[in-house]
């Protein structure tokens, strides 16, 4: 394959007279560096710059050395060593820093050199080229103007097949280790590209007959069954569920890991695949199954596996959303509040890496919107700092939702929900223009129906708080309802305020029926008796925190005043 003519500029720009440099591109002379970059942007012939060649050769050597060391250790029946750990650390630095910097400088909106072009530089190393293509296609999806072509979508799928076949179909453990961040990104991107293709194939209006025929004749490419098969195979190969079961009970997971699960590559891919299955089932609208795949992961306990922040944030986002759609509002609020507090306290750590910050910041905003919805439908106390953030962001919208404005509910849901998809290949002979929106519209209808059922509850709650006893007929009159309609709404109130709530145990599906409503009532003949069940707010903790903040501010001001 060759670049389209207008993409030659992506590789352009090698000045044969400039300082060749090593893979980090610095000469030490700012003027020379700037001139080099300008020449790089202006020239348009197909030559791989020396700086990129050096980087790719260094990248290949690091991966190749790691594989050689891993082969040696597998032959010696050793799981890992300090040498392997050091090589993984070097690859992590290349992956998170060097690759990102080079991309930003030379391939910001254009593709990297194709694998076929760089193959001679790396001795046609098949494993390295698979890893390189994983990064190459991911960059096209994320940054290249116009996104991937149909051909590139297919090629990326085949490359993932090659990668997973290498890992899963070897006679023994594959001689490879990769940083946890990269392993998570592989699973995350694999599902994202499946999601992207599922939506792409439904939009046929601007596609040529040739493209539609190509899609029609290849129904198994990015098929939901193949994606599920990969994720389940990685889970089974790693024996991760059994490892987690033993780990949460206080045992040694290594004792049940098996031949493959002892190795970090398989263990972490297995764990990340569980989160991938959570995400995939959520995108398909199967919320019970989404949470069930995590039955051996204890969300409320810090795990040895939660080393990748994006994985942790993604897990909580999809678990919280699944709880919301299952009408387990109290659990959804707890999950969202916990992860938002975690993000709030560790935000500075993410800001060091732009691409991580963008992803986490987006899900942070979405979870604030989902929390606003959940708290409107099921009012309860949350952490003070999260509550303040929520009031700043969505105070007005929450007031409108409390008044029963369905438009605000729909707006926040549309903004914060996942991009739902249909697992079914469309009928290409009869695809209407909005076919790709049908999965979303179906989930929106389910959500809107639930909102509609609760439309009167906020008003009823506010009236109930005003009285301790009241004739049913009189209170019905205040609400412009007949006595029968009001009794139905009271029954709805009782039903909707009773939630299945997780209390203990590992499985997130476990729980007991509870009510955290601030008011409760019972009806005796024609009288309604109301009790305020609100727990008194502990103001002491709030004032202590404010005093500590004031003292810290006072100390800072004194230090500033002492400066000459």
Curated annotation (Swiss-Prot):
Annotated coiled-coil segments of the chain: none
Name of protein: Eukaryotic translation initiation factor 3 subunit L
Segments forming domain PCI: 331-537
Keyword Acetylation assigned: yes
Encoding gene (name): EIF3L
Function: Component of the eukaryotic translation initiation factor 3 (eIF-3) complex, which is required for several steps in the initiation of protein synthesis. The eIF-3 complex associates with the 40S ribosome and facilitates the recruitment of eIF-1, eIF-1A, eIF-2:GTP:methionyl-tRNAi and eIF-5 to form the 43S pre-initiation complex (43S PIC). The eIF-3 complex stimulates mRNA recruitment to the 43S PIC and scanning of the mRNA for AUG recognition.
N6-acetyllysine PTM positions: 465, 549
GO molecular function: translation initiation factor activity
InterPro entries from the UniProt entry: eIF3l (IPR019382), PCI_dom (IPR000717), TPR-like_helical_dom_sf (IPR011990)
Localization: Cytoplasm
Similarity field: Belongs to the eIF-3 subunit L family.
Subunit record text: Component of the eukaryotic translation initiation factor 3 (eIF-3) complex, which is composed of 13 subunits: EIF3A, EIF3B, EIF3C, EIF3D, EIF3E, EIF3F, EIF3G, EIF3H, EIF3I, EIF3J, EIF3K, EIF3L and EIF3M. The eIF-3 complex appears to include 3 stable modules: module A is composed of EIF3A, EIF3B, EIF3G and EIF3I; module B is composed of EIF3F, EIF3H, and EIF3M; and module C is composed of EIF3C, EIF3D, EIF3E, EIF3K and EIF3L. EIF3C of module C binds EIF3B of module A and EIF3H of module B, thereby linking the three modules. EIF3J is a labile subunit that binds to the eIF-3 complex via EIF3B.
UniProt record, GO biological process: formation of cytoplasmic translation initiation complex; translational initiation
Sequence positions bearing N-acetylserine: 2
Signal peptide boundaries: none
Pfam families in alphabetical order: Paf67
GO cellular component labels: eukaryotic 43S preinitiation complex; eukaryotic 48S preinitiation complex; eukaryotic translation initiation factor 3 complex
HAMAP family xref list: eIF3l
Keywords noted in UniProt: Acetylation, Cytoplasm, Initiation factor, Protein biosynthesis
Origin species: Bos taurus (Bovine)
